[in-house]
Every structure is written in C-alpha cells, then in structure tokens.
Amino acid sequence: MSTDRNVAALHDAGAQWNSGDLEGYLALDDPKAILQGYAGVEPGLPSIRRFYEAFWAAFPGSRLTFEDVFASGDKVACRFVVQGEHRGEFQRIPPTGVQITMPGITILEFRDGKCTRRWSYADSVGLLQQLGALPSR
C-alpha cells in the first residue's frame, strides 16, 4: 500500500471516530494489531476494542483531530488532539463534566492496508490533572 493510501486510511479512521463509529475506526487495525503506549492493552483487536470502548464510555462524542501527518514507507506518524467531556467513569474517576483536551503523538505501521502496530503516546498526566485526579503543575 502506498504512503498516500496509508495516510488516507488514517484520515478515514479519524472521520469514523468523529462520526461515532467505533467499528469504522477499528477497521484500520489488523486483527492481530499491537497498540503500544497504554497500560493493559494486550496484542490483538479484542483488547484494543476494549480499550477504546472504555475511553468512549468516559468521553462519549469526543473529537479526534490530526494536527500534523507525515508518512514514509509503511509508517505514518501524526500529532493528534482528543477533546471531549468527561461523562462516564474513567480509570475509577467518576464523571466530572470537565471538558478535556489531550494531545498526543502516534506512529502507525501498515501491512497490506491494515495497521499492524501503533505506538501512541498521549498526555495522560495532563488528562488526569484536568480531571482533578492529580495536582496541577
């Protein structure tokens, strides 16, 4: 798959996220995909699905914006921002109603049109501070 098609697949996944279609978002991933950077996510689509279902339950209707996207060979890298309202339990934190903004960076590796590995690093400390679970800096 060309770098242009990989970038297009990422943008399509983002559009699916923003339309509320988790299955459409997850269509980007290979069934044996690996998501690195978040604790407790085992290899494979079932574990990745559970991770995102928990996030969506806590931040329903969240928006995903890709700020920068770069591609080379079979890899796509992007800087992203997730914004939403904390309306469900998140990591044992009851809903706060707080509007959150969580920036991050992800690198995706593609094979045969599917993401096989994703390295994602988001500002989890900043998110927990916004939710009042950690003191502000």
Show where each model-derived region lies:
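Conserved functional loop/turn residues at catalytic and ligand-binding sites
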Residues: D21, K114
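A solvent-exposed, acidic/Ser-Thr-rich amphipathic alpha-helical stretch
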Residues: T3-A8, L22-V76, F80-H86
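Exposed beta-sheet edge and beta->alpha loop/turn motif
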Residues: E85-D112
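A structural signal for short, well-ordered beta-strand segments
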Residues: F80-V82, G104-T106, R118
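Low-complexity, intrinsically disordered terminal/linker segments enriched in charged
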Residues: R117-R137
